[in-house]
């Protein structure tokens, strides 16, 4: 298996162009911590669309660019490293669009994909619940068929961007008999339907991109079912692969690291050792992400990528807190980055769960007793 990641000239040109666009975006719309979840700007999404950077890896048949995954990784790396506001189109581009062109009906593809590609439509993902986080199969939100509709009742939490989203991709339970994971289905839920209440959740760093969603007798057209009824668990695992194998978690703290470097005492041996470890970590993390984008390692390899990159982010935050000292409490972005670090290894799949995936599916170790 090749580990030759020599950058092609066209990739370097893309990187330079993405960096220039990101810098202009930051100058106009501000620099954002975790810009892929906090930096909402539809105007900047339209800039990305004009560049062909939304849906750039989607098949040409569905309006996408048909470009290799490594090119999207390079573009995203520059955007997030700069703190450019890409959140408005991020979930649609990364997960919802691929889910719809893979599993959706022709009508769903025709109606929904163009809005994603233009940067007009905003999406969120209704997955986690108060009693169902890492164990997706235990979720309780129900969708009961009633003629040409599903009647949805339940609650979602930790839903990024729900307050501004026009659509929510909701995982719900359509069947109670049989194995729990086989009773799950995915519905496209317009957020303006009656019976939906969205409440922003103020997190420990003072931001409110997370929301909880309450669904009370929400009537969703049955035509909004994505894929097969009862097939959501498998479909969701594919979606999580897109999330876990991305560059976002590796470089979200890059602005914080750059700031810490400006204030670091390079005469201190401990500081030099930490910098060497972090720089090595960045390079290893990038190799893991690039390897996945080039189709090496298999689908389950993304679990290891996510586990490594989030733990690396935590090391960056710890380094910055030590180097900056009291200055780390000044402003908004720096305290947010440091205080939010403990959550990195929880959201999107805990490190413990990801290690189980690697052990059981990649190393073929015995399954964890349940």
What are the residue ranges of the model-derived segments?
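A short core secondary-structure module
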Residues: 148-149, 153-199
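A short, Trp-centered hydrophobic/proline-enriched beta-strand micro-motif
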Residues: 119-127
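Internal helix-loop-helix
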Residues: 50-119, 161-167, 243, 282, ...
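Glycine-rich beta->alpha junctions and the first turn(s) of the following alpha-helix
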Residues: 3-9, 14, 196-287, 344
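Amphipathic, small/basic residue-rich leader segments at the start of a protein or domain
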Residues: 1-89, 111-118, 246, 269-278, ...
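Glycine-rich phosphate/pyrophosphate-binding beta-alpha loops
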Residues: 132, 157-162, 204-205, 343-350
């Amino acid at each position: 298996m090749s580990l030759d990641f020599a950058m092609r000239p066209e990739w370097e040109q893309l990187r330079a162009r993405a960096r220039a666009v990101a810098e202009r975006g930051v100058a106009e719309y501000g620099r954002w911590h975790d810009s892929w979840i906090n930096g909402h700007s539809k105007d900047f999404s339209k800039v990305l669309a004009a560049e062909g950077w939304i849906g750039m890896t989607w098949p040409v048949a569905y309006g996408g660019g048909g470009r290799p995954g490594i090119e999207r990784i390079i573009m995203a790396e520059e955007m997030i490293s700069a703190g450019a506001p890409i959140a408005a189109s991020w979930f649609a581009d990364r997960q919802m669009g691929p889910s719809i062109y893979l599993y959706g009906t022709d009508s769903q593809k025709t109606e929904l994909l163009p809005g994603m590609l233009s940067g007009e439509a905003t999406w969120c993902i209704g997955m986690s619940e108060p009693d169902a986080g890492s164990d997706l199969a235990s979720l309780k939100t129900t969708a009961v068929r009633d003629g040409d509709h599903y009647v949805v009742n339940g609650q979602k939490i930790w839903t990024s961007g729900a307050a501004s989203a026009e659509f929510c991709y909701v995982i719900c339970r359509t069947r109670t008999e049989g194995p729990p994971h086989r009773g799950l289905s995915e519905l496209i839920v317009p957020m303006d339907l009656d019976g939906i209440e969205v409440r922003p959740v103020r997190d420990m760093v003072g931001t409110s991109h997370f929301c909880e969603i309450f669904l009370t007798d929400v009537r969703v057209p049955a035509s909004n079912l994505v894929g097969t009824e009862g097939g959501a668990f498998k479909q969701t695992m594919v979606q999580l692969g897109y999330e876990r194998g991305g560059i976002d978690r590796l470089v979200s703290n890059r602005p914080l690291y750059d700031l810490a470097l400006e204030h670091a005492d390079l005469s201190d041996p401990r500081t030099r050792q930490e910098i060497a470890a972090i720089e090595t970590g960045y390079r290893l993390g990038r190799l893991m992400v690039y390897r996945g984008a080039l189709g090496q390692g298999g689908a389950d390899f993304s679990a290891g990528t996510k586990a490594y990159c989030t733990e690396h982010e935590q090391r960056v935050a710890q380094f910055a807190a030590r180097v900056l000292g009291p200055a780390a409490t000044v402003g908004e972005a720096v305290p947010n980055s440091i205080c939010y670090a403990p959550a990195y290894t929880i959201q999107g799949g805990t490190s413990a769960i990801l290690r189980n995936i690697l052990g059981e599916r990649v190393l073929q170790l015995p399954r964890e007793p349940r």
